């Protein structure tokens, strides 16, 4: 998937080779300027999956989401700051955040991770 492509629809099933996409993203201007960038892999009304890449030492400032979210570290090591403390999320680990939870994300080392969010609508 290139930067100009739309996110995939899961109608027929979607699969992604994450490493080359992340490598491509590290060449983007946003990555060079802010230390991180994101790309939508899937954008549906009930599910969004984003791939994010971060330079070591970069931070995504404190924020919250309307939806329950999961963070799966594909490579590297993330440190997530929550109101209750700090959670380390190294490669291969999954962190689930309840909706509305204020948090920030720091890349302890160069990292890539998948952010998945469900619908903010209650069933």
Give the location of each predicted region.
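Short beta-strand His + acidic residue motifs that chelate non-heme Fe in jelly-roll/DSBH
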Residues: 60-62, 80-81, 97, 102-108
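Short acidic-glycine-tyrosine-enriched beta hairpin
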Residues: 84-99
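A short, N-terminal "cap"/entry segment at the start of jelly-roll beta-barrel domains
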Residues: 1-46, 81
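Ligand-binding loop in jelly-roll beta-barrel domains
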Residues: 99-123
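Structural motif
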Residues: 77-79, 86, 102, 112
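Short, conserved beta-strand element in jelly-roll/cupin
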Residues: 53-55, 64-79
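A cytosolic small-molecule/anion-sensing beta-strand core signal
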Residues: 74-75, 90-91, 109
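Conserved short histidine dyad/triad with adjacent acidic residue
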Residues: 33-35, 48-65, 99
